Design a protein with these regions (language model features):
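Active-site-facing substrate-recognition patch
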Residues: 1-52
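Short Gly/Thr/Asp-enriched flexible loops that form oxyanion-binding sites at enzyme active sites
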Residues: 65-73, 140
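Conserved acidic residues
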Residues: 53, 121, 151
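PRPP-dependent phosphoribosyltransferase catalytic core
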Residues: 4-5, 137-177
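Gly/Ser/Thr-rich loops at beta-strand to alpha-helix junctions
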Residues: 59-65, 132
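Short glycine-rich phosphate-binding loop at a beta-alpha junction
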Residues: 52-59
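Short, glycine/charge-rich flexible loops or terminal/linker lids adjacent to PRPP-binding catalytic cores
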Residues: 78-123
Length: 177
């Protein structure tokens, strides 16, 4: 199996290169379960963020990073946009999303109670990797629909052309193949 050697936050990871289509492969970066990488990268991202009231992420891979950044910033909670409607959700708001790593169109949902918490607040959108930006754009639409003010968008890695974006915070670039 081909791999890509990633260096980030003083750590090294061998990422398997995964074929997504006939002309696109990516280095698969998964932070779920990697406590060390979350622990090292979260403070670096937190330092780059402006003042925020809430951290918002989409399930699932951004959750540990959102938790750790929230903890570092002394925020009492963070918000997770879900990929399906849960029984506890009352009047959820929703947007559609198309992601490079997901074959079918998906939706993101925000519980009405969470939407009310972030209304009029400064939020930072957090993810593990920003690639085409479609997931991030959907998350931004969702929180803006809730009335929040997006003041930052951040990830550990910017994949492919995302590295050239000026509107995101990231620690390292990740090539596509």
């Amino acid at each position: 199996m081909k791999t890509y050697t990633l260096h980030v936050a003083g750590l090294t990871r061998e990422l398997p290169i995964i074929k997504l289509s006939y002309d696109l492969s990516i280095a698969s970066f998964v932070i779920l379960g990697d406590t060390e990488i979350v622990k090292k990268t979260a403070p670096m991202i937190a330092k780059k963020l402006p003042d925020v009231d809430f951290i918002v992420t989409a399930e699932a891979k951004g959750i540990p990073l959102a938790y750790e950044i929230s903890r570092i910033l002394n925020l009492n909670e963070y918000i997770v946009a879900r990929k399906s409607i849960k029984a506890y959700m009352e009047e959820p708001i929703e947007v559609e999303v198309n992601s490079i790593t997901t074959t079918n169109s998906q939706k993101l949902y925000l519980n009405n109670q969470d939407a009310n918490k972030i209304k009029g607040k400064r939020v930072a959108l957090i993810d593990d990797v920003i690639s085409t930006g479609q997931s991030l754009k959907a998350l931004e639409r969702l929180v803006e629909k809730a009335g929040a003010n997006v003041v930052a968008k951040a990830a550990i890695l910017a994949e492919g052309d995302a590295k050239d974006r000026k509107d995101i915070i990231f620690l390292e670039a990740l090539p596509t193949f």
